[in-house]
Amino acid sequence: MAVNNRVKITNDIELKDRLVAINRVTKVTKGGRTFSFSAIVVVGNEDGIIGWGLGKAGEVTAAIAKGVEAAKKNLTRVPVLKGTVPHEQSAKFGGAEVFIKPASTGTGVVAGGAMRAVLESVGVTDVLAKSKGSSNPHNLVKATILALGEMRDARMVAQNRGVSMEKVFRG
């Protein structure tokens, strides 16, 4: 069941941005080579809100700024319980497949590269994560946010089913 987890940006949300990857692109023309840059940026308030954006420009700083602006327009709310995720979840985007699993307090963020940036930006402090397939940062970021967006805590499940929280746990 698709649940709308979209968040509208307001001034009271303080977002921190993290650069996931930067790529230099070369365009060969008759007059020589023209360089441009693309940047994948993740923004989050470290309290359950996450967004990602891709910025492209002739300068690195301009590409990052465009990525941040794009990320602010693409925010999603994620349930974070006691510094970890509520349950196991896997997702696939393109050739990248990710698996996210809750961890006990003190474990830390056990994840690599692009997944680590996303999980830290959303405010998860203890989690086990594994990626399979492609290590392309674009697809890893999208797959990780897709997996996080599919997370449901007990309150959300009870609300969707129209039953009490006790009935969710007792069956």
From Swiss-Prot:
Record key words, sorted: Ribonucleoprotein, Ribosomal protein, RNA-binding, rRNA-binding
Domain S5 DRBM span(s) in chain numbering: 15-78
GO cellular component entries: small ribosomal subunit
Tagged with keyword Lipoprotein: no
Taxonomy, superkingdom: Bacteria
GO terms under biological process: translation
MF terms (GO), sorted A to Z: rRNA binding; structural constituent of ribosome
Keyword Signal appears in the UniProt entry: no
A matching Pfam family: Ribosomal_S5_C
Family of this protein: Belongs to the universal ribosomal protein uS5 family.
NCBIfam families reported for this sequence: rpsE_bact
Biological role stated in the UniProt entry: With S4 and S12 plays an important role in translational accuracy.
Domain text: The N-terminal domain interacts with the head of the 30S subunit; the C-terminal domain interacts with the body and contacts protein S4. The interaction surface between S4 and S5 is involved in control of translational fidelity.
PANTHER family: MITOCHONDRIAL RIBOSOMAL PROTEIN S5
Subunit structure: Part of the 30S ribosomal subunit. Contacts proteins S4 and S8.
Entry protein name: Small ribosomal subunit protein uS5
Taxonomic lineage from the root: Bacteria, Pseudomonadati, Bacteroidota, Bacteroidia, Bacteroidales
